[in-house]
Amino acid sequence: MATKTQDSKYSRLKIKASTTDKIGSKLLYQYLVEKAKAEGISGATVFRGIMGYGTSSKIHSSRFWELTEKLPVVIELVDTTDKLEKFFKEIEEELLSMPKGCLVTMEPTEILLQKKGK
């Protein structure tokens, strides 16, 4: 059954980094999605960009001759504002300890439809 949910305030947490960034031995995006699932966050999606730049101001783009591409990546999480604020507090120190830069934003969002899969 599909439901429209607006009982709580929802937000979208975005972590913008690079496809090659790591936490320990794991890729950052893999680590964050697995941690979000373990913490019960409603949804997580990873988007890989074809071009972009961040805090280093160096433009990164897709090149067919490169085996390992350093491309922009956005990890997007959606859940209640309270759960996402708690999740961010848990990962903040790990993000700060990374040698490379990242950008984290959070914005309110409205869930129009949430249908569970089988």
Please tell me what each predicted stretch does.
Residues 1-118:
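Positively charged, small/polar-rich N-terminal and surface patches that mediate targeting and assembly
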